[in-house]
Each structure stands twice: as structure tokens, then as C-alpha cells.
């Protein structure tokens, strides 16, 4: 594929920025929020949408557009902004659909729990053996385990799998509490399978392309131990089931009527991660990702649009 001449890049960037402005104005004129929506609800949605927009811009400017010869300005402290924007997008989406209390519980408990699990697993080899992180992983470390690992699990695994599983299993953004424990256990298992599917792309990229950590032992699958994926299924099934119990215990509920702008945030993030991993061009990884990430994402989009088509018009 031919590269764009250097002299044409500023013009292309200018066209890109004009397109972004035009898109934002179009969204505004189409009334992103219902007219009767309270200001607080609008603010929560706006922050969530803005956060995912920043995340997508970073992914495009860093991973995808350079392959096409288009180079956009990089943000300062981009690795930190990327993690921060993903975390904010996840938190505000949870806030809108599950309430502030449950959103805070998810952010704090999931981030802390998975950091501890990563620390123990890395040192004790709980699933698949021990591993050690390198300086390529962004952010500071404590005891050899990066601080941002907990937030990464929260935004990139827990958040995306939670909403996608609800859509795939029940065709809704938030599952019904009826017969909750049977349904919750099944949805939690599907969520863990989605997490495993994400990690089947994420780990090969982070280990082989980004060199962010090294396994003491591996397997023929890009050097990632198979036990690592078994661990994801077991741990995430239990954790997501426990979170659904806490939702019931603390009466989680939506702030208002479902709005597509905030409902599509987890799917946008999921698809963006697929593109990011696929852009590394590791042999065979994109084919794997088409089944483990792209297919569930497409099915979830279809279920999401079907869900909104059934909703009554909002004034």
C-alpha cells in the first residue's frame, strides 16, 4: 500500500479535524439526549462519550492510521491518557446503567482485587507459571507489578465483557434480576469466555509485540501458557457472579432511559481493542481475533440495535 506524500499529511490532518467537528455538530443537531433528560444524566453521558472519543483517537493516531500513512498529533503522556480515558468511559457507563454506588464498588473492588491477583499470580505461578514485567509496561510498579494493572482489568476486561455478555445472552444492556442466580451464573460464564477471547489477542501482542512482560514457561500459542486462559474462565466467572450479587444487594438501577450514545461505549472500546491488536500483524493473530473478538462484537452490536428498536419513542 502506497504511503501519502509528506507534503499532503497536514492537508489530510486538516480534513480529519474538519470531519470531526462536522460529526460533533451533526450529533448535536440530532439531539444526543432526550429533551426531558435531567442535567445530571446528560453530564454522565457526555463524560462517558468524550472519554471513549479520546480513547479512540489515541488508538487511531497510534496504531491504525500510521499504517495508512496518516500521522496525527500524539497526545502528551499518551499512555496515561489512554488508560485514564478508558477507565473514565467504563466508570461513567456503569454509573449511568448501574448507579453511582455500584459503579464505585466495581471500580474500587475490581481494580484492587485484580491487582492483588496479578501480584500473586506473577510471583507464585497460580495459572500457567510465573512471569515478570518489564519497563515497557506504562506506569509505576509495586513489588514488580504495575499499578495500572487493576485499572486495565477493570476497563479492558470486566467492563467490556459485562455488557457484551448481557447483550448476547439476554438481548438487553442490563440483565433482569428474575431467577437471578441461575441467569447470573450463566451470564458470568459467558462474560469470562469473552474475557478469555480478548486475552487471546491481548497477551500475544503485549508479550511479543510490546514486550511488556515475559513468561517463565510458555506454550506453542505465542508463548502464552494454556493455564493462563483457564484461570481467566475460573476467576472471572466467580468475580462477575459476585458483582451481580452485589448489584442485587445494593439495588442497582439505571439513572434514566437507555441512550444509545452511552450504551455503545463498551462495544466501541471492544472493537477498538480488536483493531489495535490486529494492527500489530502478528502471524495468524488476526484470524484468531476474528472469532474471539470480532464475531462476539458484531453479534452484540446487532443485539444492541434490536434492543433499541423495541423501545418506545422518547420525547
Model region roles, listed by residue range:
Residues 24-315:
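Aromatic-rich, lipid-facing transmembrane alpha helices and their immediate juxtamembrane interface loops
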Residues 20:
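Non-catalytic, largely sequence-independent nucleic-acid-binding elements associated
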Residues 8, 14-17, 28:
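Intrinsic-disorder-associated, low-complexity terminal segments enriched in Asp/Asn/His/Tyr and depleted
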Amino acid at each position: 500500500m502506497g504511503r501519502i506524500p509528506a507534503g499532503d499529511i497536514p492537508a489530510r490532518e486538516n480534513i480529519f479535524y474538519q470531519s470531526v467537528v462536522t460529526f460533533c455538530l451533526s450529533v448535536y443537531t440530532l439531539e444526543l439526549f432526550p429533551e426531558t433528560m435531567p442535567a445530571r444524566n446528560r453530564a454522565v453521558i457526555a463524560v462517558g462519550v468524550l472519554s471513549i472519543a479520546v480513547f479512540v483517537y489515541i488508538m487511531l493516531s497510534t496504531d491504525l492510521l500510521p499504517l495508512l500513512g496518516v500521522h496525527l498529533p500524539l497526545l502528551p503522556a499518551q499512555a496515561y491518557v489512554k488508560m485514564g480515558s478508558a477507565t473514565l468511559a467504563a466508570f461513567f457507563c456503569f454509573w449511568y446503567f448501574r448507579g453511582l454506588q455500584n459503579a464505585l464498588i466495581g471500580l474500587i473492588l475490581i481494580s484492587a482485587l485484580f491487582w492483588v491477583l496479578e501480584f500473586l499470580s506473577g510471583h507464585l505461578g497460580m495459572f500457567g507459571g510465573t512471569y515478570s514485567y518489564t519497563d515497557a509496561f506504562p506506569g509505576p510498579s509495586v513489588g514488580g507489578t504495575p499499578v495500572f494493572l487493576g485499572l486495565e482489568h477493570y476497563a479492558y476486561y470486566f467492563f467490556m465483557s459485562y455488557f457484551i455478555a448481557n447483550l448476547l445472552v439476554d438481548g438487553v444492556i442490563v440483565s433482569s434480576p428474575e431467577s437471578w442466580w441461575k441467569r447470573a451464573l450463566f451470564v458470568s460464564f459467558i462474560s469470562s469466555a469473552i474475557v478469555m477471547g480478548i486475552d487471546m489477542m491481548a497477551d500475544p501482542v503485549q508479550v511479543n509485540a510490546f514486550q511488556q512482560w515475559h513468561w517463565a514457561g510458555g506454550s506453542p500459542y505465542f508463548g502464552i501458557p494454556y493455564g493462563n486462559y483457564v484461570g481467566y474462565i475460573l476467576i472471572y466467572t466467580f468475580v462477575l457472579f459476585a458483582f451481580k450479587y452485589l448489584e442485587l444487594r445494593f439495588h442497582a438501577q439505571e439513572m434514566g432511559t437507555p441512550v444509545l450514545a452511552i450504551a455503545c461505549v463498551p462495544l466501541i472500546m471492544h472493537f477498538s481493542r480488536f483493531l489495535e491488536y490486529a494492527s500489530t500483524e502478528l502471524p495468524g493473530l488476526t484470524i484468531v481475533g476474528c472469532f474471539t473478538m470480532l464475531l462476539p462484537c458484531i453479534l452484540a452490536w446487532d443485539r444492541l440495535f434490536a434492543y433499541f428498536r423495541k423501545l418506545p419513542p422518547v420525547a
